[in-house]
């Protein structure tokens, strides 16, 4: 039985590697922002120890650690509150061996001015012809996790549907799969692997020709090319290691280290033509399982400067958390001091364990 599961995992990884060599397109980058302020406060270095409702995003294998149903909510804003990022998830154990989860992510910009009709047929500017539209990305994910016969080993899979809308101009549907495993040793070391977009998640776009014509004719000589109708998201691999240390019963320190791998050449700190690797390190200090202080560093990049030299940057993060009787409130601030060119934000999240109602 174990040999069968090992064969499935090896086959999935081989498929991931071989497909990555033929895929060059990027899409669905909103799915890389992350969920759960507790995880963001640790620079997303959570793939090995995630064990709650948010595991549906980070590593579905962690869902098997649920003891009761859980609900999670998150909100954050980017670009001076122009873009809003929201997340809701629900997870439920089926029995002591398996669990399921359902989550929804929305990243959108609302009330964008549509000025394609600003100038009427007579060449006059008429502000009454200006309308509003929204652009939004949605991802609905169903997760399933199960323990394997080997003690401490579990696996999980995600099936996700992606919907992207740009007003009445264009829209797309997409579909993809993720898979993850977790393993905990007898001395409490935890290992995790999360393979995202193992089937090269795709988006198939459709366009409103009349609306696009308005854009193409707005400025002569510009905006003349219709974008490609198909986007592919290359596979990504996240490998993690973590351990929790307990001191004098009341104090704990969780340390976690992750390697984030893309099968493309980027400006990550470790980059080759085959793959690029970006490390992340996270810490969580806890007191009586009630108050938590978190810190992390990730997104290490070799940024190109104006003089063509390279400068190593990273994205620090900080977080606070409070948990009382099944209700957890977490806060994270990412990219402290604007150390990198990445997005930064104040992030708040809420997690409710339904055991408080029993």
Each language-model region and where it sits:
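N-terminal signal peptide c-region/cleavage motif recognized by signal peptidases
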Residues: 15-17
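Subset of outer-membrane beta-barrel
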Residues: 21-358
């Amino acid at each position: 039985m174990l040999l069968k599961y090992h064969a499935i995992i090896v086959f999935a990884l081989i498929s991931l590697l071989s497909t990555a060599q033929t895929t060059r397109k990027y899409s669905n980058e909103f799915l890389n922002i992350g969920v759960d302020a507790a995880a963001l406060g640790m620079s997303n270095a959570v793939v090995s120890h995630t064990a709650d409702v948010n595991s549906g995003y980070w590593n579905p294998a962690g869902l098997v650690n649920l003891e009761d149903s859980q609900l999670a909510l998150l909100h954050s804003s980017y670009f001076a509150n122009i873009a809003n990022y929201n997340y809701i998830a629900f997870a439920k154990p089926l029995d002591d061996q398996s669990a399921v989860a359902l989550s929804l992510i929305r990243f959108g910009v609302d009330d964008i001015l549509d000025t394609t009709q600003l100038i009427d047929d007579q060449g006059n500017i008429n502000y009454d012809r200006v309308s509003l539209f929204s652009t939004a990305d949605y991802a609905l994910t169903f997760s399933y996790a199960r323990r394997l016969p080997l003690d401490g080993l579990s696996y999980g899979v995600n099936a996700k549907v992606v919907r992207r809308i740009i007003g009445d101009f264009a829209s797309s549907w997409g579909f993809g799969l993720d898979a993850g495993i977790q393993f905990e040793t007898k001395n409490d070391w935890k290992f995790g692997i999360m393979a995202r977009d193992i089937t090269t998640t795709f988006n198939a776009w459709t366009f409103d020709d009349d609306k696009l014509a308005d854009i193409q004719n707005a400025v002569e000589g510009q905006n003349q090319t219709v974008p490609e109708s198909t986007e592919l998201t290359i596979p990504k691999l996240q490998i993690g290691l973590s351990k929790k240390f307990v001191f004098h019963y009341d104090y704990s320190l969780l340390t976690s280290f992750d390697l984030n791998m893309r099968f493309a050449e980027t400006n990550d700190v470790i980059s080759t033509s085959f793959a690029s690797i970006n490390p992340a390190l996270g810490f969580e200090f806890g007191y009586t399982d009630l108050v938590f202080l978190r810190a992390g560093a990730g997104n290490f990049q070799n940024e190109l400067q104006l003089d063509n030299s390279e400068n190593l940057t990273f994205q620090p993060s900080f977080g606070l958390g409070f948990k009382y009787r099944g209700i957890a409130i977490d806060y994270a601030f990412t990219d402290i001091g604007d150390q990198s060119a990445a997005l930064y934000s104040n992030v708040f999240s809420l997690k409710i364990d339904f055991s408080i109602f029993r």
